[in-house]
Amino acid sequence: MIEIIQVREADVPREQLSVTIITLNEERNIRDCLESVRWADEIIVVDSGSTDRTIQICLEYTDRIWTNPWPGMNEQKRVALNHAAHPWILNIDADERVSDDLRGHILRVLETQDADGYRFPRKNYFLDRWMKHGGWYPDHVLRLFKKERGRYAGMDPHDKVVVEGRVRTIPAPLVHHTYSSLSQYVSRQNAYSNASAEALVRQGARIFPLLIPLKTLWKFFETYIVKMGFMDGFHGFVAAMGASFTTFWKYAKSWDLTRKKEHTLTLP
């Protein structure tokens, strides 16, 4: 059973909160992101080498900024976590925004502390449309947790927080502006499929070529039909096609990397 938390106003002491954000060339997104969390007790930014105005914009909101070469999604978020000074952590990405409703719930949580971690739905926008189907919503993410109870244990390029203890659900959404153009989407998915393929190879996963087209077709069918992506109109079709292509490249690239590795090992 999912436990739902309701917010109420109360003027009582609360624990302090550190917001952690990792960045790379996010000048288009970062200001709105920071505005949505400027009420926090501390904002931590770990940048992996931005060449645009990301750092300059961040300095308007916090001086807790570090530069660290990109080690992977989960490791970079661990770096940010280690810099946080307060007992509660809220991790968000540069293209995400804390809604006013979510803010109220978070402040209530910092007063009651009736769990060790909290998940909430993510309201994803794809090409400027709120995607309500195709697996895009409610897309619960666990981003608020006690520092001493949470750790990152995901497989790049996707982060995952594991909390030791009780986890509850907040109904208010985190707003996520994913991609504003198809060019941006294709570029990002190419990078994601590279990282996913490399992770599969590191894990020693065996990729059977005959299964790749089946996985690709299933991803489209699952996204567009099973999860009713068609209800989001042409946006839903584009998203389902994109998901299937990303699945194809993820496994095809993994197969290619494994093939090259085995070929190198068999050279005289």
What are these model-predicted stretches?
Residues 1-35:
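N-proximal low-complexity "stem/linker" segments adjacent to membrane-targeting elements
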Residues 29-31, 52-61, 101-102:
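Acidic helix N-cap motif at the loop->helix transition within catalytic regions
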Residues 35-41:
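Short, acidic, metal-binding catalytic loop of nucleotide-sugar glycosyltransferases
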Residues 36, 47-56, 93:
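A conserved acidic beta->alpha catalytic loop
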Residues 41, 62-63, 85, 114:
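Residue-level detector of structured alpha->beta connecting loops
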Residues 44:
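Conserved beta-strand positions in the Rossmann-like core of class I SAM-dependent methyltransferases
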Residues 55-83:
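Conserved donor nucleotide-binding strand/loop of the catalytic core
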Residues 78-82, 87-92, 99-261, 267-268:
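Catalytic-site signature of metal-activated, phosphate-bearing donor transferases
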